[in-house]
Swiss-Prot record:
Gene3D superfamilies: Bira Bifunctional Protein, Domain 2. Keywords: Aminoacyl-tRNA synthetase, ATP-binding, Cytoplasm, Ligase, Magnesium, Metal-binding, Nucleotide-binding, Protein biosynthesis. Transmembrane segments: none annotated. PROSITE patterns: AA_TRNA_LIGASE_II (PS50862). It is found in: Cytoplasm. This is Phenylalanine--tRNA ligase alpha subunit. Mg(2+) binds at residue 270. Binds 2 magnesium ions per tetramer. One of its GO terms (biological process) is phenylalanyl-tRNA aminoacylation. One of its GO terms (molecular function) is tRNA binding.
């Protein structure tokens, strides 16, 4: 049998002299591989007599363990030396600027909505909210919509299937149902955050999502609306006119905006009107406060006596006005966005272009400036 001590010394010497991991792996295969010299010795133990196995077995196993330990230690030393070499060769320039951070942008709808809330907060308006899923009474009946009014039809309103009680809910077509909830006050058996009930005088705005079965470049099935409601004694159209003109000048940040009011019809107001602003439509864009064209931007009027009665208020004692405007549409006009549908897309590039820095967010306590 091969002199085990001499074999061990030779293998340990070669292991220590190995220059890299590849050379070390070759020695391991030669000694400990499937057909390696030490592996063959271990296989030969089966052919020995019991006395020879008892004598040679521990020696061969000791040789195998010594060689395996030497290989593992040498491999760790070679890998550490290679890492030190790479680290010594690398250079980090601490003066290089870091890669730019991608900051989030405030969506134009949220920016415009915050701007509107800030303007109305300056005029003393509070905030009210209501549910997106409404019933016929709050969305139509209480607001003086006749039973056969076109707005009740399927092509204008998203109706939900009947429930077990035979009632049909709908996605609200405007934020006006919150007017009813505010004026009815404690008569509404709803949580306080939905009911928003309060006794007159009332001065609130109601921002929120509304839903109509319509879709083109200037209409979407879901959009954002802001409703305004004032209830007090001796309220008249002059108060409505001042409120809307003041809002328009502050929102568009143009003192020279010219407005006009045209008679219109809404079931829930009487008299009713629409407000136009003077603008310039030349050049493929709309510029508010310039030119000689006119553009309708909102509607309003005096709260209809029937609506007041439906909400438990005496129209001989209380009067009020209401108005509604499209948040997304006014944002398009103010900032020149061409297609309303883009505001409901998911293109991050569009948001990076049209979005706002969080530092530009208006504050209801301080207004737009």
């Amino acid at each position: 049998m091969t002199d085990l001590t001499q074999l061990q010394a030779g293998l340990i010497g070669r292991i220590e002299a190995a220059a890299d991991v590849a050379a070390l792996e070759a020695i391991r295969v030669e000694a400990l591989g499937k057909s390696g010299s030490i592996s063959e010795m271990l296989k030969g133990l089966g052919k020995m007599s019991p006395d020879e196995r008892r004598e040679q077995g521990p020696k061969i196993n000791g040789l195998r363990d010594a060689v395996a330990t030497a290989i593992a230690e040498k491999k760790a030393a070679l890998e550490a030396a290679e890492l030190d070499r790479k680290l010594a060769a690398e250079r980090v320039d601490l003066t290089l600027p870091p890669p730019p951070e991608r900051r989030g942008r405030v969506h134009p709808t949220m920016q415009v909505l915050d701007e509107m809330i800030a303007v109305f907060a300056e005029m003393g308006f509070g905030l009210a909210e209501g549910p997106d899923i409404e019933d016929d009474f709050h969305n139509f009946t209480a607001l003086n919509f006749p039973p056969k009014h076109p707005a009740r039809e399927m092509h204008d309103t998203f109706w939900l299937p009947q429930n077990e009680a035979g009632e049909r809910k709908l996605l609200r077509t405007h934020t006006s149902p919150v007017q009813v909830r505010v004026m009815r006050g404690t008569n509404e058996k709803l949580p306080a955050w939905i009911a928003n009930g309060q006794a007159p005088p009332i001065r609130v705005i109601v921002p929120g999502r509304v839903y109509r079965s319509d879709s083109d470049a200037t209409h979407t099935p879901m959009f954002h609306q802001l409703e305004g409601l004032v209830i007090d004694r001796n309220i008249h159209m002059g108060h409505l006119k001042w409120t809307l003109e003041t809002f328009t000048r502050r929102f568009f940040e143009a003192e020279g905006v010219v407005t006009r009011f045209r008679p219109h019809h809404f079931p829930f107001t009487e008299p009713s009107c629409e407000m136009d602003v003077q603008c310039d439509r030349s050049g493929g864009s709309v510029k508010i406060g310039q030119g000689s064209d006119w553009l309708e931007i909102l509607g309003g009027g005096m709260v209809h006596p029937n609506v007041l009665r439906n909400c438990g208020l005496d129209p001989d004692e209380w009067q009020g006005f209401a108005f509604g405007l499209g948040v997304d549409r006014l944002g398009m006009l103010k900032y020149g966005m061409p297609d309303l549908r883009d505001m409901f897309g998911s293109d991050v590039r569009w948001l990076e272009h049209w979005g706002f820095s969080a530092f530009q967010a208006p504050n209801p306590a301080t207004g737009l400036s």
